[in-house]
Amino acid sequence: MISKEQKLALIKEFGGSEKNTGLAEVQIAILTAEISNMTEHLKMHKKDIPTRRSLLKKVAQRRHFLDYLVKKDVNRYKEIIEKLGIRK
């Protein structure tokens, strides 16, 4: 889980303002931060199956947002992938 401060920083960076939380880029950025935190946790706790399941759910959720972004605006998709360092 990421802190409120980290989440607010991501919202400001990718959404433009604090209230623009529904933007696909914001959702993808938040999910990416949560995924990286869970990945670090799983490196230390290899047998934590519930966290692994949650990680897979978040990866699938991020994939849905990315697919949506590809359909709506390919340029925004390419920008977010480049900024976050996500594979295609």
From Swiss-Prot:
SUPFAM superfamilies: S15/NS1 RNA-binding domain. This is Small ribosomal subunit protein uS15. The keyword Protease does not apply. GO terms for biological process: translation. One of the primary rRNA binding proteins, it binds directly to 16S rRNA where it helps nucleate assembly of the platform of the 30S subunit by binding and bridging several RNA helices of the 16S rRNA. Forms an intersubunit bridge (bridge B4) with the 23S rRNA of the 50S subunit in the ribosome. GO terms for molecular function: rRNA binding; structural constituent of ribosome. Keywords: Ribonucleoprotein, Ribosomal protein, RNA-binding, rRNA-binding. The keyword Lipoprotein does not apply. Part of the 30S ribosomal subunit. Forms a bridge to the 50S subunit in the 70S ribosome, contacting the 23S rRNA. It comes from Mycoplasma capricolum subsp. capricolum (strain California kid / ATCC 27343 / NCTC 10154). One of its GO terms (cellular component) is cytosolic small ribosomal subunit. It comes from the Bacteria. HAMAP family: Ribosomal_uS15_B (MF_01343_B). NCBIfam families: S15_bact. Disulfide bonds: none annotated.
